[in-house]
Amino acid sequence: MNKDIIKHIPFLYAISLYLWHKWKNGDKVKFWLSTRISSKCRFEGMNMVGKRTLFHGCLGYGSYIGNDSLVNAEIGRFTSIGSGFTYINGTHAYKSPFVSTSPLFFSLGKERFFSGKSFAKRQMFNEFRYFDKDRGIVNKIGSDCWIGSNVTIIGGVEIKDGAVVLAHAVVTKDVPPYAIVGGMPARVIGYRYDDETISFLLKTKWWNNTIKWLKEHWMLFCDISAFRNYFSDMFDSNMNLIKR
C-alpha cells in the first residue's frame, strides 16, 4: 500500500466516524473531529461532547462534557462536566486474603501480558468495577450535577441528582443528592440547600418536565422562592408534573 495512503488512514477514519455520528444524531449533539463517541452512545438533545474527549454511554437533555475527558457513564439531564474528567475502573488485589500483588496469582485476564501464561487456574479477583456491568457502564451521574475540571471518579461510583464535585477531586464513593464534595479522596464539605429544600427539589424532579414547560418557565430557575411557591401550589392541588 502506498505510504502516503497509510499516513492518511487515521485522518480518513476520523472523518468517516465524524460523518457517521452526524448522520446518526443530527442536531442532538455538538462535537468535533477530534471527539471520539462510541457507536452505542445515546443523546437526548442539546448536548455537547468536547474536543479530544472519549465518550461511551448516554447523555440526558441539556447535558455536556468538556474537552480532554474520558467518560463512560449514564448521565442525567442538565448536567455539566468540566474538562479533564476521567475514570478509573481497574483495581488490584493488595490486601488480605491475597498474599501477592502480582496478577499471576489471581488473574486469568492478565495472561496477555505474560505470553499467555498465568499460575492461576481460575479467576480469583474482580479486576474491574462497573455501575452496570451488563451494559458496560462504569459510572452513573444524575441530573442537575456540576462536575469541575480534572475530576477523577472510581468505577462503580454514582453521583446523585444535584450534586457538585469540585475541581481536582478524586471521588471514591457515591455522592449524595445535592452534596458538595471535594478533595482527595473527595469528602462532603457542604450541601447546596437545607434538608427541606433538597427533599422538595427531589420531589419535583423538575428535569423530567417537558422541554416546552422548561422554556416557558425558565425564570423560575433564577429564584428558588418563586420555584418553591409554584410547585407547592401544584402539589397542594394534587396536580401531576407533565412528563416528557
Q: What do the predicted segments below correspond to?
A:
Residues 168, 194:
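ATP/adenylate-binding site constellation spanning eukaryotic-like Ser/Thr protein kinases
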Residues 153-163, 169-172:
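Beta-rich strand-turn-strand
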Residues 169, 173, 177-179, 187:
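Glycine-centered loop/turn positions within well-structured domains
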Residues 1-144, 150-151, 177, 186, ...:
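Domain-scale signature associated with acetyltransferase and cell-envelope carbohydrate enzymes
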